[in-house]
Structures are given as structure tokens and as C-alpha cells.
Amino acid sequence: MTDHALLLVNLGSPASTSVADVRSYLNQFLMDPYVIDLPWPVRRLLVSLILIKRPEQSAHAYASIWWEEGSPLVVLSRRLQKVMSEQWKQGPVELAMRYGEPSIESVLLKLVAQGQRKITLAPLYPQFADSTVTTVVEEARRVVREHKLDVQFSVLQPFYDQPEYIEALEASTRPHLQQPFDHLLLSFHGLPERHLNKLNPGHSLDGAGDCCAESSPQVLANCYRGQCFRTARAFAQQMGLADGQWSVSFQSRLGRAKWIEPYTEARLDELGKQGVKKLLVMCPAFVADCIETLEEIGDRGREQFREAGGEELVLIPCLNDDPQWAKALNALCERAPLAL
């Protein structure tokens, strides 16, 4: 059969490392109400203030990790698309970005123009958050509604603890963990605590451990932090790691609001000062390497760890276009339920 398309969706990237392109990208990203969940006037004012200095700073960071072919995130996502085209036998495989190009709107219209009426929408985020999964689904809904598209959607569900995903992580990281190391840090992208509190009012996010260790499935389904801990523990068990060999942290904090803890920056300092000499870092919230992994951890994080007394920080690559990951993703997408 060739009448069921697969649409992979990742976050996105500036078109280039120019300050103008980075400013345009950041404006689209930060003005998303699922990213900065404040009333429009407040959000507009805040983003305008951020865009005074941030584009130049971010442009420098992007330039430090930019590849000859372009943005690492886009290049690696394209490579995954190519591998997935060999796995997904039901129809074409396309790639869209939530921010930047190719947009979800342009790719959906392209698929419909080709005669596709069944589409599996695959947000490439293992854990659920409004600022990742929900905004992708809502953008697809907007396009369908505004263009009156006659399509049937399935949506890939969060797969933070699915065996195929954990086994793909194991296969891609085992060569690194077979070498001597002192500690493994699983650094996930952070979120403001208020994002989680809106979905689970009254749910405690305090402490360094799993906030959902004793929570109901309903609470866990909306708790990004708890899902990150489930990913980490499932991976550690799969690898046979003892509790003291690994820990969880959250990176990429923006602004002054309280974000979920423990913070990666603080953890890097702690580990260096505790005598950890060789630190492995993996970033399981990202399926493709990007500025948050390559620059934030691979460059700035490495320097910070060394300044705290550590000797070597090894950044374990994301799943990227690993064949086992593509096989796992194919299986997960085949199980995607009808939605939209």
C-alpha cells in the first residue's frame, strides 16, 4: 500500500547563522503560546525584550556548531527521513519543522496535493509536553481547519518508556558505556514548573528524585518530569547500571521563572567538585543532535565541568539516523492511534 503518508516533525532551526535569521526564528518560537504561556500582550513585550540581545548571542552559538550542509538538526532529521523512507512501506515519508522551514502547513498541503488522505503525524519527542507535542498537533489542526482538508490523521504517542525506544538508546550508547567512566548524566530539556502545574494542579515537583514514583497513570501522562525519570530508569535498568552510576538533570533554562530541577548547570558543578573525572552525558529528550546538545553540553557544559575539577566530558550522540532507531520509530508509528 502507498496511500498512508508519514510526517516526521521536529522543532526546527534558523535558516542560517545570520542574526536576522536567528531573530526571525526565535520570534516565531517564543511567540508560540505553548512555549511562553502568558497573555499575548505580556508575551509580546517579553519576547521583544529577549530579542534585543538574544539573537546575536544565539547566532554566535549556532555558528560554532553549524555544518557545511546546514543546521545539524535539519541535516540529521533529513537523514532520518531518508532511512525511514526505507522502513515505512505504506506511503511517502516527509519532514516538517514546527518553527522555520519546511513548515507543517507547506508539507501537509504538499501531501494532500499528491492525493494523500491518511497521514501519521509523528512529533519526534519521546516525552509529552504542551510546548512540544501539543503545539505540533494544534498546528496540524489549524492547517486542516483553515484549508478544509479532507484527511485522516493518526498521531504518534509519547514513547518515553516504550521498549523499542529504550532498546534503540541502549544500542546507540552501549559502545560509550563499555569504556571506563565515573558517572552518566542524563540531561533532559527543562520546562518552567508552571507548564506542569497547569496540567497537574497540586502535583509536587520538589526534590531531586522522581516526582511520579507513586503517581497515578493519569498524573504521569501529563507530567513531563516524571516521564523523563521513567526514561532514565528504564534505560539504566536496560544497561544494568547501579543507582549511584547515573543521575538526571534538566538543561536550557530561560528567564527567571522556576524551572524543573535539578538543573544541569548545577549538576555539572557538583559532579566536578565531587571528584568525577570522566563524565558521560546523554540527552534523551532530543532524538537528533542540535544546539542544545552540541553547543550547550558539548562546548559550554564541557568547559564548565572542567572548571569544576572534572577532566573529560563525553557527549554521547543522540539517536539521529541510527538504523535501529528508525526501525523502532517505524514500529511506534505503525501503532499510532487515530486522532484529530
UniProtKB/Swiss-Prot annotation:
Any GO BP: heme biosynthetic process
One GO location term (cellular component): cytoplasm
EC number: 4.98.1.1
Protein role: Catalyzes the ferrous insertion into protoporphyrin IX.
Single Gene Ontology MF annotation: metal ion binding
Subcellular location as annotated: Cytoplasm
Binding site for Fe cation: H189, E292
Enzyme class: lyase
Keywords: Cytoplasm, Heme biosynthesis, Iron, Lyase, Metal-binding, Porphyrin biosynthesis
Catalytic activity: heme b + 2 H(+) = protoporphyrin IX + Fe(2+)
Major site of localization recorded for this protein: cytoplasm
CDD domains tied to this protein: Ferrochelatase_C, Ferrochelatase_N
Stated family: Belongs to the ferrochelatase family.
Designated name of the protein: Ferrochelatase
Pathway recorded for this protein: Porphyrin-containing compound metabolism; protoheme biosynthesis; protoheme from protoporphyrin-IX: step 1/1
HAMAP family with a match to the protein in the record: Ferrochelatase
Species in which this protein is naturally found: Pseudomonas fluorescens (strain ATCC BAA-477 / NRRL B-23932 / Pf-5)
InterPro entries named among the record's database cross-references: Ferrochelatase, Ferrochelatase_C, Ferrochelatase_N
